[in-house]
A protein has these predicted regions:
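C-terminal motif of bacterial Sec signal peptides marking the signal peptidase cleavage site
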Residues: 33-35
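Sec-dependent N-terminal signal peptides
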Residues: 17-29
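Intrinsic disorder/low-complexity segments
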Residues: 6-11, 31, 49, 360
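Generic hydrophobic alpha-helical membrane-segment signal
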Residues: 6-9, 23, 248
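Kelch-like beta-propeller repeat domains
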Residues: 3, 37-43, 47, 54-365
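N-terminal secretory signal peptides that target proteins for export/translocation
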Residues: 1-17
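Generic short amphipathic/hydrophobic targeting helices enriched at N-termini
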Residues: 2, 12, 22-25, 76
Length: 365
Protein backbone atom coordinates (compact mmCIF):
# COMPACT_ATOMS: atom_id res chain seq x y z
CA UNK A 1 0.00 0.00 0.00
CA UNK A 2 1.15 4.06 2.29
CA UNK A 3 5.21 7.49 0.92
CA UNK A 4 8.36 9.60 0.75
CA UNK A 5 12.00 8.55 0.56
CA UNK A 6 15.13 9.47 2.35
CA UNK A 7 15.00 13.15 1.49
CA UNK A 8 11.34 14.14 1.40
CA UNK A 9 12.21 17.70 0.48
CA UNK A 10 13.38 16.55 -2.94
CA UNK A 11 10.44 15.73 -5.18
CA UNK A 12 12.37 13.06 -7.04
CA UNK A 13 13.47 11.13 -4.00
CA UNK A 14 9.98 10.45 -2.79
CA UNK A 15 9.31 7.77 -0.32
CA UNK A 16 6.45 5.71 -1.55
CA UNK A 17 4.87 3.32 0.89
CA UNK A 18 2.56 0.60 0.73
CA UNK A 19 -0.87 1.45 -0.09
CA UNK A 20 -3.10 2.08 2.62
CA UNK A 21 -5.47 4.99 2.61
CA UNK A 22 -8.21 6.57 4.53
CA UNK A 23 -9.56 10.03 4.90
CA UNK A 24 -12.25 11.89 6.69
CA UNK A 25 -15.41 13.82 6.00
CA UNK A 26 -14.46 16.77 8.16
CA UNK A 27 -12.95 20.09 7.24
CA UNK A 28 -11.53 21.24 10.55
CA UNK A 29 -7.80 21.87 10.78
CA UNK A 30 -5.83 19.95 13.39
CA UNK A 31 -2.92 21.86 14.97
CA UNK A 32 -0.03 19.80 16.31
CA UNK A 33 3.09 21.05 18.08
CA UNK A 34 5.73 18.37 18.11
CA UNK A 35 8.97 17.66 19.93
CA UNK A 36 10.93 14.59 20.94
CA UNK A 37 10.01 14.75 24.62
CA UNK A 38 7.26 13.22 26.73
CA UNK A 39 7.40 9.80 25.05
CA UNK A 40 4.49 7.44 25.29
CA UNK A 41 4.81 4.18 27.12
CA UNK A 42 5.84 1.09 25.21
CA UNK A 43 3.82 -2.07 24.91
CA UNK A 44 5.05 -5.60 24.40
CA UNK A 45 1.68 -7.23 23.90
CA UNK A 46 1.10 -9.18 20.73
CA UNK A 47 -2.20 -7.50 20.01
CA UNK A 48 -5.49 -8.88 18.79
CA UNK A 49 -6.12 -10.62 15.54
CA UNK A 50 -6.85 -8.00 12.89
CA UNK A 51 -9.54 -8.13 10.30
CA UNK A 52 -8.53 -8.27 6.67
CA UNK A 53 -11.95 -7.03 5.57
CA UNK A 54 -12.89 -3.38 5.39
CA UNK A 55 -16.36 -4.30 6.64
CA UNK A 56 -14.98 -5.05 10.11
CA UNK A 57 -12.97 -1.87 10.55
CA UNK A 58 -14.46 0.61 12.99
CA UNK A 59 -13.73 4.27 13.59
CA UNK A 60 -12.14 4.95 16.96
CA UNK A 61 -14.89 6.08 19.31
CA UNK A 62 -12.51 7.87 21.63
CA UNK A 63 -10.78 10.08 19.10
CA UNK A 64 -10.13 13.69 20.02
CA UNK A 65 -12.14 16.22 18.09
CA UNK A 66 -10.41 17.51 14.96
CA UNK A 67 -8.81 20.84 15.60
CA UNK A 68 -7.99 20.20 19.25
CA UNK A 69 -4.28 20.95 19.71
CA UNK A 70 -1.86 18.57 21.35
CA UNK A 71 1.37 20.08 22.66
CA UNK A 72 4.45 18.41 24.06
CA UNK A 73 7.91 19.71 24.68
CA UNK A 74 10.59 20.75 27.09
CA UNK A 75 12.85 23.75 27.36
CA UNK A 76 15.52 23.70 24.67
CA UNK A 77 13.89 20.91 22.70
CA UNK A 78 13.53 21.74 18.99
CA UNK A 79 9.94 21.47 17.86
CA UNK A 80 8.08 21.16 14.58
CA UNK A 81 4.65 22.71 14.10
CA UNK A 82 2.28 20.58 12.07
CA UNK A 83 -1.11 21.41 10.65
CA UNK A 84 -3.40 18.85 9.05
CA UNK A 85 -6.46 19.51 6.92
CA UNK A 86 -8.37 18.19 3.95
CA UNK A 87 -6.99 19.34 0.61
CA UNK A 88 -9.03 21.59 -1.67
CA UNK A 89 -9.24 18.82 -4.27
CA UNK A 90 -10.56 15.26 -4.23
CA UNK A 91 -9.98 12.16 -6.32
CA UNK A 92 -12.53 11.29 -9.05
CA UNK A 93 -13.58 8.23 -7.07
CA UNK A 94 -12.93 6.62 -3.72
CA UNK A 95 -9.80 4.48 -3.57
CA UNK A 96 -7.82 2.74 -0.86
CA UNK A 97 -4.44 1.02 -0.83
CA UNK A 98 -2.90 2.96 -3.73
CA UNK A 99 0.78 3.72 -4.21
CA UNK A 100 1.60 7.42 -4.37
CA UNK A 101 4.70 8.99 -5.93
CA UNK A 102 5.83 12.58 -5.62
CA UNK A 103 6.44 14.06 -9.06
CA UNK A 104 7.57 17.44 -10.30
CA UNK A 105 4.72 19.73 -9.31
CA UNK A 106 2.39 17.03 -8.12
CA UNK A 107 1.51 13.46 -7.25
CA UNK A 108 1.05 10.21 -9.12
CA UNK A 109 -1.67 7.99 -7.62
CA UNK A 110 -1.30 4.42 -8.85
CA UNK A 111 -3.64 1.44 -8.52
CA UNK A 112 -5.55 0.55 -5.37
CA UNK A 113 -8.98 -0.77 -4.43
CA UNK A 114 -12.26 0.84 -5.47
CA UNK A 115 -15.35 1.25 -3.31
CA UNK A 116 -16.65 -1.91 -5.00
CA UNK A 117 -13.63 -3.80 -3.60
CA UNK A 118 -12.13 -4.33 -7.07
CA UNK A 119 -8.53 -3.68 -8.06
CA UNK A 120 -8.06 -0.68 -10.31
CA UNK A 121 -5.50 -0.10 -13.04
CA UNK A 122 -5.99 3.66 -12.85
CA UNK A 123 -3.06 6.09 -12.81
CA UNK A 124 -3.99 9.63 -11.74
CA UNK A 125 -1.87 12.76 -12.05
CA UNK A 126 -2.41 15.47 -9.43
CA UNK A 127 -1.35 19.02 -10.26
CA UNK A 128 -0.79 20.62 -6.87
CA UNK A 129 -0.43 24.17 -8.19
CA UNK A 130 -3.80 24.09 -9.93
CA UNK A 131 -5.40 21.51 -7.58
CA UNK A 132 -6.56 19.39 -10.51
CA UNK A 133 -6.66 15.64 -10.98
CA UNK A 134 -6.65 13.91 -14.35
CA UNK A 135 -6.38 10.39 -15.72
CA UNK A 136 -2.77 9.74 -16.76
CA UNK A 137 -2.75 6.11 -17.87
CA UNK A 138 -3.49 2.51 -16.99
CA UNK A 139 -1.36 -0.12 -15.30
CA UNK A 140 -0.49 -3.12 -17.47
CA UNK A 141 -1.05 -5.23 -14.32
CA UNK A 142 -3.74 -3.79 -12.00
CA UNK A 143 -2.64 -4.03 -8.35
CA UNK A 144 -3.39 -2.81 -4.85
CA UNK A 145 -1.20 -3.10 -1.74
CA UNK A 146 1.88 -2.68 -3.91
CA UNK A 147 4.96 -0.59 -3.07
CA UNK A 148 6.88 2.06 -4.94
CA UNK A 149 10.36 3.56 -4.98
CA UNK A 150 12.34 5.89 -7.20
CA UNK A 151 15.31 4.12 -8.77
CA UNK A 152 17.64 6.12 -11.00
CA UNK A 153 14.91 8.66 -11.60
CA UNK A 154 12.30 6.05 -12.53
CA UNK A 155 9.04 5.58 -10.62
CA UNK A 156 8.86 1.83 -10.05
CA UNK A 157 5.94 -0.17 -8.69
CA UNK A 158 6.75 -3.50 -7.03
CA UNK A 159 4.39 -6.46 -6.69
CA UNK A 160 0.94 -6.02 -5.18
CA UNK A 161 -2.29 -7.95 -5.02
CA UNK A 162 -5.12 -8.59 -7.46
CA UNK A 163 -6.73 -11.90 -8.34
CA UNK A 164 -3.33 -13.30 -7.32
CA UNK A 165 -0.19 -11.92 -5.71
CA UNK A 166 1.97 -10.27 -8.37
CA UNK A 167 5.72 -10.30 -8.98
CA UNK A 168 5.58 -7.61 -11.66
CA UNK A 169 7.85 -4.57 -11.55
CA UNK A 170 6.07 -1.78 -13.42
CA UNK A 171 7.64 1.48 -14.59
CA UNK A 172 5.04 4.25 -14.20
CA UNK A 173 7.33 7.24 -14.74
CA UNK A 174 5.38 10.16 -16.26
CA UNK A 175 6.20 10.90 -19.89
CA UNK A 176 6.19 7.30 -21.08
CA UNK A 177 3.64 4.51 -21.32
CA UNK A 178 3.46 2.36 -18.17
CA UNK A 179 5.10 -1.02 -18.73
CA UNK A 180 6.28 -4.16 -16.98
CA UNK A 181 10.08 -4.11 -16.98
CA UNK A 182 10.91 -7.16 -14.84
CA UNK A 183 9.74 -9.37 -12.00
CA UNK A 184 10.59 -9.82 -8.36
CA UNK A 185 12.26 -13.14 -7.46
CA UNK A 186 8.93 -14.12 -5.85
CA UNK A 187 5.44 -12.61 -5.85
CA UNK A 188 4.82 -10.11 -3.03
CA UNK A 189 1.90 -8.05 -1.79
CA UNK A 190 1.28 -5.95 1.33
CA UNK A 191 4.93 -4.91 1.14
CA UNK A 192 6.88 -1.65 1.44
CA UNK A 193 9.70 -0.08 -0.54
CA UNK A 194 12.08 2.84 -0.03
CA UNK A 195 14.92 4.51 -1.89
CA UNK A 196 18.22 5.89 -0.64
CA UNK A 197 18.83 7.78 -3.86
CA UNK A 198 21.16 5.16 -5.34
CA UNK A 199 19.03 2.04 -4.98
CA UNK A 200 15.57 0.80 -4.11
CA UNK A 201 14.85 -1.62 -1.27
CA UNK A 202 11.88 -4.00 -1.08
CA UNK A 203 10.85 -5.28 2.34
CA UNK A 204 8.08 -7.25 4.02
CA UNK A 205 4.83 -8.52 2.56
CA UNK A 206 3.86 -12.07 1.72
CA UNK A 207 3.80 -14.34 -1.32
CA UNK A 208 0.20 -15.44 -0.97
CA UNK A 209 0.84 -18.07 1.67
CA UNK A 210 3.83 -17.14 3.83
CA UNK A 211 5.52 -13.97 4.98
CA UNK A 212 8.54 -12.62 3.11
CA UNK A 213 11.67 -11.93 5.17
CA UNK A 214 14.26 -11.35 2.44
CA UNK A 215 15.33 -7.75 1.92
CA UNK A 216 15.90 -7.01 -1.76
CA UNK A 217 17.99 -4.25 -3.30
CA UNK A 218 17.83 -3.11 -6.90
CA UNK A 219 19.87 -0.47 -8.68
CA UNK A 220 18.02 -0.70 -11.99
CA UNK A 221 14.59 -2.24 -11.28
CA UNK A 222 15.53 -5.32 -13.29
CA UNK A 223 17.96 -7.28 -11.15
CA UNK A 224 17.63 -7.90 -7.43
CA UNK A 225 20.12 -8.87 -4.74
CA UNK A 226 19.28 -10.20 -1.29
CA UNK A 227 21.03 -7.90 1.17
CA UNK A 228 19.51 -8.99 4.46
CA UNK A 229 16.69 -10.67 6.34
CA UNK A 230 13.92 -9.19 8.44
CA UNK A 231 13.90 -10.50 12.02
CA UNK A 232 10.09 -10.66 11.83
CA UNK A 233 8.06 -11.06 8.65
CA UNK A 234 5.34 -8.41 8.47
CA UNK A 235 2.54 -7.34 6.18
CA UNK A 236 1.16 -3.78 6.21
CA UNK A 237 3.97 -2.12 8.21
CA UNK A 238 4.74 1.58 8.12
CA UNK A 239 8.21 2.41 6.81
CA UNK A 240 10.67 5.30 7.00
CA UNK A 241 14.34 5.97 6.34
CA UNK A 242 16.44 7.83 8.91
CA UNK A 243 20.07 7.82 9.99
CA UNK A 244 21.27 5.37 7.36
CA UNK A 245 18.67 2.78 8.33
CA UNK A 246 15.24 1.58 7.27
CA UNK A 247 12.68 1.46 10.06
CA UNK A 248 9.59 -0.76 9.99
CA UNK A 249 6.80 0.06 12.43
CA UNK A 250 4.28 -2.61 13.40
CA UNK A 251 2.39 -4.53 10.75
CA UNK A 252 0.85 -7.97 10.84
CA UNK A 253 2.81 -11.11 11.66
CA UNK A 254 1.14 -14.52 11.40
CA UNK A 255 -2.27 -12.84 11.27
CA UNK A 256 -1.77 -10.70 14.37
CA UNK A 257 -0.85 -7.05 14.67
CA UNK A 258 2.52 -6.40 16.24
CA UNK A 259 4.23 -3.64 18.22
CA UNK A 260 7.69 -4.42 16.83
CA UNK A 261 10.01 -1.68 15.60
CA UNK A 262 12.55 -3.21 13.22
CA UNK A 263 15.75 -1.44 12.17
CA UNK A 264 17.66 -2.47 9.04
CA UNK A 265 21.16 -1.07 8.57
CA UNK A 266 21.50 -0.07 4.90
CA UNK A 267 25.27 -0.61 4.98
CA UNK A 268 25.34 -4.12 6.43
CA UNK A 269 21.80 -5.33 5.73
CA UNK A 270 21.55 -6.44 9.34
CA UNK A 271 18.09 -6.26 10.87
CA UNK A 272 16.99 -6.27 14.49
CA UNK A 273 13.96 -5.58 16.65
CA UNK A 274 15.02 -2.50 18.60
CA UNK A 275 11.83 -1.39 20.32
CA UNK A 276 8.06 -1.42 20.41
CA UNK A 277 5.12 0.79 19.56
CA UNK A 278 2.85 1.80 22.46
CA UNK A 279 0.23 -0.63 21.10
CA UNK A 280 -0.18 -3.10 18.21
CA UNK A 281 -0.58 -1.23 14.93
CA UNK A 282 -0.91 -2.10 11.24
CA UNK A 283 -2.16 -0.41 8.05
CA UNK A 284 -0.50 2.86 9.15
CA UNK A 285 1.99 4.94 7.17
CA UNK A 286 5.10 6.86 8.10
CA UNK A 287 6.58 10.01 6.61
CA UNK A 288 9.46 12.38 7.28
CA UNK A 289 8.96 16.15 7.58
CA UNK A 290 11.80 18.54 8.43
CA UNK A 291 13.90 15.67 9.76
CA UNK A 292 11.16 14.30 12.01
CA UNK A 293 9.75 10.80 11.52
CA UNK A 294 5.99 10.50 12.03
CA UNK A 295 3.67 7.48 12.10
CA UNK A 296 0.04 8.28 11.30
CA UNK A 297 -3.28 6.50 11.28
CA UNK A 298 -3.68 2.76 10.88
CA UNK A 299 -5.62 0.14 12.76
CA UNK A 300 -5.37 -1.23 16.25
CA UNK A 301 -7.42 -4.38 16.19
CA UNK A 302 -10.43 -3.50 14.04
CA UNK A 303 -10.41 0.14 15.12
CA UNK A 304 -9.21 2.81 12.70
CA UNK A 305 -7.21 5.53 14.46
CA UNK A 306 -6.48 9.20 13.81
CA UNK A 307 -3.41 9.30 16.04
CA UNK A 308 -0.09 10.81 14.96
CA UNK A 309 3.11 9.71 16.72
CA UNK A 310 6.58 11.16 16.42
CA UNK A 311 9.43 8.64 16.50
CA UNK A 312 12.84 9.43 17.99
CA UNK A 313 15.38 7.06 16.35
CA UNK A 314 18.11 7.96 18.85
CA UNK A 315 16.07 6.94 21.90
CA UNK A 316 13.65 4.53 20.20
CA UNK A 317 10.77 6.46 21.73
CA UNK A 318 7.37 7.57 20.50
CA UNK A 319 5.61 10.82 21.36
CA UNK A 320 1.88 11.25 20.85
CA UNK A 321 1.67 14.56 19.01
CA UNK A 322 -1.93 14.89 17.91
CA UNK A 323 -4.57 13.72 15.49
CA UNK A 324 -5.44 13.70 11.82
CA UNK A 325 -8.74 15.37 10.87
CA UNK A 326 -10.33 11.94 11.20
CA UNK A 327 -9.61 8.24 11.62
CA UNK A 328 -7.58 6.92 8.70
CA UNK A 329 -5.94 3.72 7.49
CA UNK A 330 -4.70 2.15 4.27
CA UNK A 331 -3.79 5.45 2.62
CA UNK A 332 -1.02 6.20 0.16
CA UNK A 333 1.48 8.86 1.16
CA UNK A 334 4.11 11.02 -0.52
CA UNK A 335 6.02 14.09 0.61
CA UNK A 336 6.51 17.20 -1.52
CA UNK A 337 8.62 19.86 0.16
CA UNK A 338 7.40 20.29 3.72
CA UNK A 339 3.97 18.76 3.09
CA UNK A 340 2.90 15.13 3.34
CA UNK A 341 -0.10 14.11 1.23
CA UNK A 342 -2.23 11.28 2.60
CA UNK A 343 -4.22 10.06 -0.38
CA UNK A 344 -7.45 8.08 -0.30
CA UNK A 345 -7.69 5.27 2.21
CA UNK A 346 -10.30 3.71 4.47
CA UNK A 347 -12.31 5.48 7.15
CA UNK A 348 -13.44 2.70 7.44
CA UNK A 349 -14.87 2.63 3.89
CA UNK A 350 -12.78 3.84 0.91
CA UNK A 351 -12.71 7.61 0.48
CA UNK A 352 -11.78 10.05 -2.30
CA UNK A 353 -10.23 12.71 -0.09
CA UNK A 354 -6.65 13.88 0.40
CA UNK A 355 -5.20 15.10 3.70
CA UNK A 356 -2.35 17.60 3.79
CA UNK A 357 0.04 17.55 6.75
CA UNK A 358 2.33 20.57 6.72
CA UNK A 359 5.42 21.24 8.82
CA UNK A 360 7.03 24.46 9.93
CA UNK A 361 10.27 24.71 11.85
CA UNK A 362 9.92 25.99 15.39
CA UNK A 363 6.63 26.49 17.12
CA UNK A 364 6.07 27.10 20.79
CA UNK A 365 5.75 23.94 22.87
Amino acid sequence: MSVAPVDPSTAHRHQVLRLLNAACAVTAVGLLTVSCSTPTGSSTSAGSSPSSSRAHAATAPGSAAPGSPTQTGAAGTPSVRLTSALAAFTLPAAVSRPTVFATVGGLLVVGGLTAADSTTSSILRVDLAHTTVRQAGQLPVPVHDAAGAVVKGRDLLFGGGSTAVSSAVQDVTPGASPRVISHLPQPRADLVAVSDGAAGYVLGGFNGSTGSTTILRTRDGRTFATVGTLPVSVRYPAVAVSGGAVWLFGGEHAGRQTTDVQRIDLTTGRGSVVGHLPHPLAHASAFTLRGGVFVAGGRTGATVTDAVLRFDPARIRFTAVGHLPGALSDFGVAVVGSTAYLVGGESPKPVNTVIQVRAQAGGTP
